[in-house]
């Protein structure tokens, strides 16, 4: 029994380069999603003010 060896997985420390690339990829993905959301909100706001300026909509409640 003393001669038997069990294969164990060797644990390595964290790979700094790999973690940097993963962090960079996640950061760019999150930043891209945030910019797309921001552009969508800008488009909605711009459309609202364009319609308001042309008189197609009003922010004053219509009196009956």
Curated annotation (Swiss-Prot):
TM stretches of this protein: 15-34
Any coiled-coil regions, as ranges: none
Annotated InterPro entries: COX5C (IPR008432)
Annotated localization: Mitochondrion inner membrane
Keywords: Membrane, Mitochondrion, Mitochondrion inner membrane, Transmembrane, Transmembrane helix
UniProt keyword Translocase, yes or no: no
Major localization listed first in the record, in broad terms: mitochondrion
GO cellular component terms attached to this protein's record: mitochondrial inner membrane; mitochondrion
Domain of life from the UniProt record: Eukaryota
Family annotation (PANTHER family): CYTOCHROME C OXIDASE SUBUNIT 5C-2-RELATED
Functional summary from the UniProt entry: This protein is one of the nuclear-coded polypeptide chains of cytochrome c oxidase, the terminal oxidase in mitochondrial electron transport.
Family to which the UniProt record says this protein belongs: Belongs to the cytochrome c oxidase subunit 5C family.
Stated name of the protein: Probable cytochrome c oxidase subunit 5C-1
The organism of origin for this protein: Arabidopsis thaliana
Taxonomic lineage of the native organism: Eukaryota, Viridiplantae, Streptophyta, Embryophyta, Tracheophyta
């Amino acid at each position: 029994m003393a001669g038997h060896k069990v294969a164990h997985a060797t644990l390595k420390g964290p790979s700094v380069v790999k973690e940097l690339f993963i962090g960079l990829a996640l950061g760019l993905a999150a930043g891209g999603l945030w910019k797309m959301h921001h552009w969508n909100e800008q488009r909605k706001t711009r459309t609202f003010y364009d319609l308001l300026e042309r008189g197609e909509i009003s922010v004053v409640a219509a009196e009956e």
